[in-house]
A protein has these predicted regions:
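Central antiparallel beta-sheet cores of small beta-barrel/beta-sandwich binding domains
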Residues: 47, 62-151, 155, 160
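N-terminal helix-cap/turn-to-beta initiation motif at the start of protein domains
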Residues: 45-59
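Short, structured patches in soluble enzyme cores that scaffold and shape functional sites
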Residues: 147-149, 166, 176-178
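Edge beta-strand at a domain terminus
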Residues: 126-138, 171-198
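Compositionally biased, proline/threonine/alanine/serine-rich low-complexity intrinsically disordered stretches
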Residues: 17-46
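Extended Gly/Ser/Thr-rich low-complexity repeat segments
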Residues: 157-170
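Bacterial N-terminal signal peptides
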Residues: 4-16
Length: 198
């Protein structure tokens, strides 16, 4: 009797379920509207006077003795300027100095300003004012800068000229030429051969 009662109850339950209207289908969630990224802003037009210097763009490094190295980074020309930085790292990790360089296209010339600071970021008392150089010539992946005509504004000391050039696609060469002291032969130029950091 208990089994029959249980079967009767189950059948009644089944019949009532079968007779009940089917539940309404669950609405399918609509996909969110596609979101498009905003268009990248147009880059400022680069001053044509800086285009011959674009070869300097990138990160460059040279290994030196005793585990030391030098690094130089140049942002691409944008608008009327480009920016560069330089540091020398000793084998023990210390950085004795940094240099920060700005190249700017002015109305009738291209200038290079450079600040030199100690490793603790304090300015060198002998170089509080930036050095001022002027682009002498540029082309063919080579550029030469010379001190401004007014020595008081140039703050270039015994510097004669600075030249950057590419030696192949992945080697940036920096040549620093000192002035010859009166009555003495010119000192040998300093040359830094820096490989592109990839």
């Amino acid at each position: 009797m208990i089994i029959r009662a249980a079967l009767t109850l189950a059948c009644a339950s089944f019949i009532s379920c079968a007779a009940a209207p089917a539940p309404a289908p669950t609405p399918v969630a609509q996909a969110a509207p596609a979101v498009t990224a905003p268009a990248a802003p147009a880059a400022p037009k680069t001053n044509a006077a800086l285009e011959p210097l674009a070869f300097m763009t990138g990160a460059w490094a040279q290994a030196q003795a005793n585990g030391a190295m030098i690094e130089e980074h140049w942002m691409a020309p944008r608008g009327s300027s480009m920016l560069g930085s330089f540091r020398r790292i000793l084998g023990n990790g210390a950085v004795p100095f940094y240099e920060f360089t700005q190249i700017v296209a002015e109305k009738d010339r291209v200038i290079l300003r450079q600040m030199h600071v100690h490793g603790n970021f304090e300015p060198d008392p002998k170089r509080v004012e930036p050095m001022l150089l002027v682009l002498e010539k540029a082309g063919g992946n080579r550029a030469t800068f010379v001190p401004a005509a007014d020595p008081a504004k140039a703050n270039a000391g015994d510097l004669s000229r600075v030249t950057y050039f590419l030696d192949g696609p992945d080697m940036l060469v920096l040549v620093v030429e000192p002035k010859a002291a009166e009555g003495k032969p010119a000192e040998k130029p300093l040359e830094f051969r820096m490989s592109r950091v990839k």
